[in-house]
A protein has these predicted regions:
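Small-residue-biased structural context
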Residues: 1-154
Length: 154
């Protein structure tokens, strides 16, 4: 989910490290890796000269939406109870995380509403810029989770 073409190897190593170090969140880190791969595929598609593959475009959008939904549900299952009930957890940090998650979810939902298939086809370059912004927001959230939130469950 990083900048197009930048940091993929670094992020993969970061995710692998987090997954091995914090066993309760290994599956969540793997989901981040899968979402990053889908995002990279969409980024590659948007960097092409024009909109051409309606089927692949639709498949990627659906796959990303499903992966994000599954990830948020998994976080709620894996982290929800442990994070909010464990004594000594920093309440301000958890509240910040909750706000960040909600902000990203709302932003992503708005992005999907704003960029229908027809809208993306009509202004492919602008769609590519919007995708890069959305992916950047998601990457910021994922890095925050991997460095600030997931380690709290260890």
């Amino acid at each position: 989910m990083g900048e197009p073409g930048h940091g993929d190897d670094i992020m993969s190593r970061s995710t692998q490290s987090a997954a091995s170090e914090f066993a309760p969140t290994a599956a969540l880190c793997e989901q981040h890796r899968q979402i990053r791969k889908l995002a990279a595929d969409l980024t590659t598609m948007t960097q092409q000269s024009g909109f051409s593959d309606t089927e692949e475009f639709g498949r990627l959008r659906v796959a990303i939406s499903r992966a994000l939904q599954a990830h948020f549900e998994a976080e709620d299952r894996v982290l929800g109870h442990a994070m909010w009930s464990k004594s000594g957890m920093p309440a301000a940090l958890l509240a910040d995380w909750d706000r960040r998650r909600q902000r990203f979810r709302m932003s992503y939902s708005q992005h999907v509403r704003d960029w229908t298939l027809a809208d993306a086809a009509r202004d492919w370059a602008a769609y590519g810029r919007a995708v890069a912004l959305c992916i950047g927001e998601g990457e910021t959230l994922a890095r925050f989770e991997e460095t600030e939130i997931y380690p709290l469950t260890a």
